[in-house]
Amino acid sequence: MPEIDARLREDVHQLGELLGDTIREQYGPAFLDKIERIRKGAKAARRGSAEGAQQLTATLDGLEESELLPVARAFNQFLNLANIAEQYHRIRRRRPNEPEPFENLALEELLGRLKDAGHAPGQLARQLAGLEIELVLTAHPTEVARRTLIQKYDAITAQLATKDHADLLPEERSRIQRRLQRLVAEVWHTDEIRKVRPTPVDEAKWGFAVIEHSLWEALPNVLRHVDEVLLRSTGERLPLSAAPLRFASWMGGDRDGNPNVTAGVTREVLLLARWMAADLYLRDIDRLAAELSMQEASPALLARVGDSAEPYRALLKQLRERLRLTRSWTHQALAGEVPAAEGVLEHNRDLVEPLQLCHESLHACGMGVIADGALLDCLRRAATFGLFLVRLDVRQDAGRHAAALSEITEYLELGSYAEWDEKTRLEFLLEELNSRRPLLPAHYQPSAETAEVLATCRAIAAAPPASLGSYVISMAGQPSDVLAVQLLLKESGVDWPMRVVPLFETLDDLDNAGPCMERLLTLPGYRSRLSGVQEVMIGYSDSAKDAGTLTAAWAQYRAQEKLVEICRHHEVELLLFHGRGGTVGRGGGPAHAAILSQPPGSVAGRFRVTEQGEMIRFKFGLPDIAEQNLNLYLAAVLEATLMPPPAPEPAWRAQMDRLAKDALHAYRRVVRDDPQFVEYFRLATPEQELGRLPLGSRPAKRREGGVESLRAIPWIFAWTQTRLMLPAWLGWETALLNAIERGEGALLGQMRERWPFFTTRIDMLEMVLAKADADIARLYDERLVPLELRPLGRRLRDLLSQAVRVVLGLTGQSLLLAHASETRESISVRNSYLDPLHLLQAELLARSRRCRGDACGGLEQALLVTVAGIAAGLRNTG
């Protein structure tokens, strides 16, 4: 087994030592010895030592009540420090003989393959410049780490980078060491659990901070890399106006199931984004004004600024004044309705035009090397982020729109919209959409719920169109769901064609997505209300919770194929929006592989996807890592567009139909049909306690009820904590075994080798099974589950073992992840720190369920720390 890189080991060891020193300083050497005994016992137990297992449990059992929290914190913080070291290792300085990372080479290598396949250089340059990739940042409540700590973690990363030079003087090394010691101590003495739930505005500010501290720097670097690669490969440059990557957000716009996101919140977040954008551009302009001290300028520039000794500075000064005015106005508008003063920047062209004039002038005067420095970076940012930083999506449940329209139709004595069939609804909606008179009389007084729906639509009408993305309708199922929103927007004064996007997210809705869109596109007048593309969102989380990951994945694939076919037939351009989570159970996984496994024709130069919770930090939290991931997105979308995977063969389709049918039956037999399942789930996992964790602004439950009432995130998060990982694999074990017993093993092998969709699914399944651990899950059962429910736990663990056996048989390996030994080694190293947290968590859950009143405070804090630690150790929470 190849060892983890020695430099990574050294960083992890050093940070661990510094944490140990900090703990010894506060609690003394005897306490640190206990932590070491726990760690060594866990490590030995993992190697099969009964003595080690005994040492682990004896030391944990012997802990005083007052020691539970610091022990949990110690293992939690070690895992966070290991994550920092691992993340830095991905971007550390390369030694002279080391190859460049795959992410940096992917685009150039792809352009070479595309040219070899017959694509003309000019066509490749146009295609790459015209890509439309939009990453939608969402605040799903899986970002366990606090913002305060994230900033300290980033400072530790910076020190690791400073240390990574062979030519440091001894005093420089000791200065770095002291700074690291201070930072680790700051981390240790900072409470890692938020005391209060973040508001939607807090979440939006967190998203803006990722842009400010990482993406603002990463984006121009990525486009500079694209420009250089294009020039080498095709002889052409990336146009200044090209924005192949853009960013949108749901933070402050996603009100589905979140009563805290109101129309007022949406307005506030839109203004905050404008304030942040103006502030970031002002920093850029200050730097440019210092740099561009040249005198020689083009006639066009001189005509704008008159007789000036420093024409570039004169023009930038005008832009700076307008940016200051814009920032000042947004600040005032946050306190109350204030009309925009003259000079406030309203259109992106007002920002871009003076910058472009400077760029053209410098090139015309033989100063291209200056033009293509910081000024070009600022132009790239202006094309990508614009004046509004991100485009804000709005999302609401279809039921809320239907309820609002019902109230309106009843008030107008037209009957109850909710009780009408689809045909009647469509007739009413089409008539109202085409009518010139308003639907609502001026004196109409709606209920609070309807007033909020209408206020949201009015907030959209009041916002600049360029600041908004799409209006997403969750739980959409019928054409009327889309027209209902179009009517409410029209009624509220939205006079531009906002994209209204149905989100198909249950198994039935995915199966019905094609017929629904077919009907919609043939409705009279619908096409004329379309703004360019038809966007459709595919939900990964809820469909997987509804049907299991295998059946859901096949339904998502078929729905996309059908939508591609229908839009092609109607000559409408399709944009698919992928609502993926961070975990496999919610459609997560490496983006590069996921994009290349989409159905042929479904990408076509456009790709929109959610980036969620903790995955935003792991993928985009540091500029260098953000660059790697953005490079991968560009290469994958270009490849999926110009070299799409083959269409599945009929035999593969038939096999997927059989697998999906068997998997659905097996999944629902457990999750829906077993009368003990919901009670077992609530007792064997920390599901109830997760609701008390102040993670995101959204409640964890939709309403009272069984599994279907749970949001997809706590559903996954709870099973991850106990290492059963049930949602990610349940159904696969039965479907694959049935196929093998029918003699279809060779066909499965062929699908795995030749069909990217199936390959990616099996790879993701293998990764999840490598992180799952039946022994840990059993410990939770023994501590928390009454005797009468334990047979169900045993059965689920048997199914997990069956899944492992079947996957090993299919991949021809004796060990999971045998082909990815570094990943296996990383999981194995983490287990020594995770195992004590799991044991502690099971014990704390048992105690907290017995205790009442004030005595629970300390237990609860320790319990929440174990939740955060396990999430950090497994690197994908929900």
UniProtKB/Swiss-Prot annotation:
Required cofactor(s): Mg(2+)
Magnesium recorded as keyword: yes
Matches recorded under SUPFAM superfamilies: Phosphoenolpyruvate/pyruvate domain (SSF51621)
Enzyme Commission number(s) from the entry: 4.1.1.31
Keyword Nucleotide-binding attached: no
CC annotations in GO: cytosol
GO terms of molecular function: magnesium ion binding; phosphoenolpyruvate carboxylase activity
Domain of life: Bacteria
Gene Ontology biological process terms from the UniProt entry: carbon fixation; oxaloacetate metabolic process; tricarboxylic acid cycle
Catalytic activity entry: oxaloacetate + phosphate = phosphoenolpyruvate + hydrogencarbonate
Active site: 140, 545
Keywords on record: Carbon dioxide fixation, Lyase, Magnesium
Enzyme kind, highest EC tier: lyase
Pfam families hit by this protein: PEPcase
InterPro entries: PEP_COase (IPR021135), PEP_COase_bac/pln-type (IPR022805), PEP_COase_Lys_AS (IPR018129), PEPCASE_His_AS (IPR033129), Pyrv/PenolPyrv_kinase-like_dom (IPR015813)
Function: Forms oxaloacetate, a four-carbon dicarboxylic acid source for the tricarboxylic acid cycle.
Family: Belongs to the PEPCase type 1 family.
Entries under HAMAP family matching the protein: PEPcase_type1
Protein name (Swiss-Prot/TrEMBL): Phosphoenolpyruvate carboxylase
Species for this entry: Pseudomonas paraeruginosa (strain DSM 24068 / PA7)
